[in-house]
Design a protein with these regions (language model features):
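Symmetry-related core transmembrane helices of the 12-TM Major Facilitator Superfamily/SLC fold
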Residues: 153-173, 378-396
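C-terminal ends and interior cores of transmembrane alpha-helices
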Residues: 46-71, 282-296
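Juxtamembrane intracellular "pre-TM" segments in multi-pass secondary transporters
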Residues: 179-212, 413-415
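Cytoplasmic helix-loop-helix junction between adjacent transmembrane helices
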Residues: 76, 82-120
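C-terminal transmembrane helical hairpin of 12-TM major facilitator-type secondary transporters
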Residues: 273-320
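Extracytoplasmic gate region of multi-pass secondary transporters
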Residues: 206-260, 351-352
């Protein structure tokens, strides 16, 4: 199997086709608020299974030479379509899980629960990245000419199997969710008001919502797109061996496994959610400024800076996501989270393209040993600028919290 760079770019971009341009993520949020977590969660699981199954079929099947689908080679078009469907399921599953956590932990250890959920998700991502190549290699074959061919569909089949197990697990969860609803009724809890379409207007006219959404897109735009270029930065600026260059950026997601639940627990018990977001934004600015300045271009300094970024990357999400239910009523949470994710996806699509353009147009260095070098100073200042903007909105959010009494500085645990 051979896929050109252009085809691979089309395939990877497919994740956002339906979510961003067809507004499926927002529609999913509305369905979540109207139909509930059980219906929406099962639907999201089935979409993920369908999408992954389509990808597996596309990658494992040999199609007629010259056949096309959606204006692309059939294999690429079918795989991209599967990835787009999978992306809808993933994003809707994400907002569904967030609403489930609020349902179970509101007034309790909500930030800790969200932190543990984020840590578990990142652990899954790390494992997926770690086992893909070994599995493809293990199930590979050597042809008659002695050329080894890795089994590319094998990791996809494993993922499809894991998704099926996850779907069964969520189906089992639905029974526990029914029990929770029954126990709340027995305790005399007031039934939640039904979601109405006019609630969308109430969300988008809520200043606190937009402050959180803009803080989210600016902060994540300075982290995830940076990680796409971080390995090359380690090579170009800090002279790290290319085979080891990915080790330093990998410290960031590894650190969040432990720090995000830790800071979430702090928010639950002590409060200071807006302050945590401000501190995280300040650390983000500091880190990208250090990466931009021509000082201490050695590997150990880059490692220290990356660890500090990991702290900032844990501080903001641990406080930001649990703060949304303090600003938005629970009946509107699915739509609110969907809108935030939708805004975030625009940033995560646009910023990598911006950085790539800046590198190619303004940051090219000499060609060394046949390889193009780049000066990452300007991109790092751009990332620092996103951090400054995130800090501005974090400070604004803290001021708005004082006016509106959202309770962002108060503990989540109600005594």
């Amino acid at each position: 199997m051979c896929i050109r760079d252009r085809d691979y770019g089309i395939f990877t971009s497919a994740y956002g086709w339906f979510n961003v341009f067809a507004f499926m993520l927002i529609i999913g949020g509305i369905i979540l608020d109207k139909m509930g977590v059980r219906f929406t969660g099962m639907g999201a699981c089935l979409l993920m299974v369908l999408g992954c199954g389509l990808k597996y079929y596309a990658i494992s099947t040999t199609f007629a030479e010259g056949s096309t689908l959606l204006g692309m080679k059939t294999q690429v078009g079918l795989a991209a379509l599967g990835y787009a469907i999978f992306g809808v399921g993933v994003e809707i599953a994400g907002i569904t899980v967030s609403k489930i956590i609020v349902k179970w932990f509101k007034g309790k250890e909500m930030a800790l629960a969200m932190g543990m959920e984020m840590a578990t998700a990142r652990l899954g991502t790390m494992l997926a990245l770690a086992v893909t190549v070994p599995i493809a290699t293990f199930f590979g074959i050597t042809d008659d000419e002695g050329v080894f061919h890795p089994n590319i569909p094998a990791p996809l089949l494993l993922c499809l199997t894991m998704l099926c197990i996850g779907t069964v697990a969520f189906f089992i969860y639905t029974f526990y969710d029914k029990k929770l609803d029954a126990s709340l009724e027995e305790e005399g809890a007031e039934p939640e008001e039904p979601f109405r379409m006019k609630d969308i207007w109430l969300i988008v006219t809520n200043k606190g919502f937009w402050l959180i959404a803009l803080l989210c897109v600016l902060f994540y735009s300075a982290v995830f797109p940076f990680l796409k270029y971080a390995t090359d930065l380690m090579v170009q600026k800090y002279n790290v061996d290319p085979e080891l260059a990915g080790t330093i950026p990998s410290l960031l997601p590894l650190g969040t496994l432990f720090l995000t639940p830790l800071f979430g627990n702090v928010y639950d018990r002590i409060g200071k959610g807006a302050t945590l977001m401000i501190i995280g934004s300040v650390l983000l600015i500091f880190v990208h400024t250090m990466f931009a300045l021509p000082v201490l271009n050695v590997w150990w300094f880059a490692t220290i800076i990356m660890i500090i970024l990991g702290i900032g990357f844990s501080l903001v999400p641990s406080a930001m996501w649990p703060s949304v239910p303090k600003i938005i009523p629970e009946k509107q949470l699915g739509t609110a989270y969907a809108l935030i994710f939708w805004v975030q996806n625009w940033g995560l699509m646009g910023v990598p393209a911006l950085i790539g353009f800046v590198l190619n147009e303004y940051c090219k260095g000499p060609v060394v040993d046949g390889m193009q070098t780049y000066d990452y100073t300007l991109p790092m200042w751009i990332f620092a600028g996103f951090g400054v903007a995130a800090l501005f909105f974090a400070l604004w959010l803290k001021g708005e919290n004082k006016k509106k009494g959202y309770g962002l500085e108060e503990p989540n645990i109600k005594k």
